[in-house]
Amino acid sequence: MRYLSVAEITRLWGISARGVRSYCAQGRVPGAFLTGKTWSIPADARKPTRLNGRRVAPTPLLARLREEMSARTSGGIYHKVQVELTYNSSHMEGSRLTRDQTRLIFETSTISPQGEGVRVDHIISHAGEALSESLLKDLHRTLKASTSDSGRDWFAVGDYKLLPNEVGGRETTAPENVAREVRGLISSYEANRAPTLEDIVSFHVSFERIHPFQDGNGRVGRLVMFKECLRHGIVPFVIGDDTKFFYYRGLSRWDVERGWLMGTCLSAQDSFKGWLDYYRIPYSG
């Protein structure tokens, strides 16, 4: 995909650079992502239409995350989320980086344009958007671009899997059926205008069982849960590496005992509430 700068989009859309950045920061330009303080915008992106009536204001948490992301603030909740999401999710997939090493990566900005920080920025920027296939694929593309997998023709970075895969010894959806099942899952989920935490977790379970991408499904799925909590005003959570046994067991036993996974997520949510209390960010629930 070809990306354009804010200046180039300004000329195409006929609006100010400030207006372009505002649309991007509000998550209204699908596929746009922030690297440092520079927006990269898909060349085929369409100018968002004006919103009529009053807009729903972002929660205090989302507003703070976007403010600190824009300013690249260190030491606040944005920095905390970057480090904890990256450290825990990567460790669950086999990374050996320590938490201090992960923190140092962000504090010294030693990350690539397609690195961990971009993925966290992506879900913050697009938190207000409805779920879509393109959003899931964009998230997978930012996850896998610039990795060894991106050089493999059969891997399909940013697209659905070409080869069958399994998770935890369990068969997943066949490649030829993935698009249909993902569309059905999204359609069913989006029909609920006020999803609960359990609805979001249930979507995650179904997504993991489809396992639409060749690899990276767990990380994409956990980022989507975080995004959806932000979107619907629910306190988000980070699944800790130290609770991955309960998380994976909860995924496998969801049909017979939802308490395993819900308990793990609620415990993680309580920990996140502790961070919000520390940073003096109000929340509901």
Kindly give the residue locations of the regions a language model identified.
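FIC/Doc superfamily catalytic core
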Residues: M1-V29, F33-G285
